[in-house]
Amino acid sequence: YFSRQKAGVIGVDVVDEMLEASRKNFIEAEAQNPWFKSDFVDLKKGDAMNLPVENNSIDVAAQNCLFNIFKADDLKQAIAEMYRVLKPHGRLVMSDPTCEQPMNEALRNDDRLRALCLSGSLPIAEYVKMLTDAGFGTIEIRARKPYRILDPVHYPTDELIYIESIEVAAIKDPMPEDGPCVFTGKAAIYYGSEDYFDDNKGHVLLKNQPIAICDKTAAALQALGRDDIY
């Protein structure tokens, strides 16, 4: 919708039938929507391990359930490919299940459950590390929602396993010297006697105005022990 130009969007799939179905859908969409042209989308055959896309050419890349389907080595390569094709400061936007509980091997090795976006779920810290290890300097966790329960009656597990769904943007910013900036919803409000507070590290807090801060900055502000920052 926001890229109404020829080949403004690139769609990649490894299955010929899926590519053909997409072409038919775009032709139908063009007939029903006067603003849409099927050539807005350039469909290419390829896979996540070797994207048929030039280096540093994409503003926004998107995926759904990549982390759940792939195992560690393939996942590392797929993330590296996303990083390669993004422009500097480009964004990889994602939606994936996550789970803070350990999963047994029966669950982890069940290809059907992985394909259903269930048993490949990673803890959030591990999820974020995969992204920062690839070079993404800024990570924004934009939403966390309940997703599924794996119970002993229907799945090979001895305990209830709670799975969340998260929405994340990984931004191809340079990696800061003191480590990545990971945003998980924290904010700071300065309410002191001055017009603003400057931490001399790039953060200026205007009086009584909330500002989103990364976890690293939140810890640094808390360590100051000030009674005029919330």
Regions found by a protein language model. Give the residues of each.
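Class I S-adenosylmethionine-dependent transferase superfamily signal
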Residues: 65, 81-83, 131
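A short SAM/SAH-binding and catalytic strip from SAM-dependent methyltransferases
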Residues: 59-74
